[in-house]
Amino acid sequence: TALERMITVSSLTKAYKGTTVVNDLNFEVTPGIVTGFLGPNGAGKSTTMRMIVGLDEPTQGTARIDGKPYADYKRPLEKVGTLLDAKWVHPNRSAAAHLRWVAAANGMSKKRVDEVLGIVGLSDVAGRKAGKFSLGMGQRLGLACALLGDPEVLILDEPVNGLDPEGIRWVRDFVRALA
C-alpha cells in the first residue's frame, strides 16, 4: 500500500546539457529500512538524492516522500532530514551557532539544538568553530543538522566517506538505531 512506501521514485531522469546522468530510475523505500545506493563515482547517486529533496529538478519523472513531493511540505525538515554535504557550514561559526541559524531559518526551537548536539555526541564542543572540526566531527554536525526537525526520513549522502573504522561503525550503529 502507499502507506508502506516512504519514498517512491518513478521514471526519474536527469540530463545536463544532453548528458543523461540518471535514466528512468524507479524504486521504493519502506519505513524502518536502511537503504543505500551503490555505484561508481558519477553514477547519479547524489543527483538522485538532490532530486528527491527538490534541490535538482528532474528532466522527467517524479520523486515523492510519503506520497507528496518534498516541495509540498510546509515544514519539510520535520519530514526529511538531509546530509548532502557535511562541509556545508560556515567555518568561523560554532557548531551550536550553525544549528541555531538553521533552526531559526526553519522556525524551529533553539532548545532542539542542544538536544541534537547531545544525540550526536557534540555537546562538549558545541562552542568550537565548525571549521576546526575533524572529518568525523563534521559528519556528526551534519547529522545533527539533519535531525533538527525530528524527521521521519533521513537522506544521507556518503555519511561515512573518509571516516576511520571507528567513525564508520558509529555512523552505521547510529543510523540503524534510528531506523
Where are these regions (language model features)?
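Helix-to-loop junction immediately C-terminal to a conserved catalytic motif
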Residues: 53
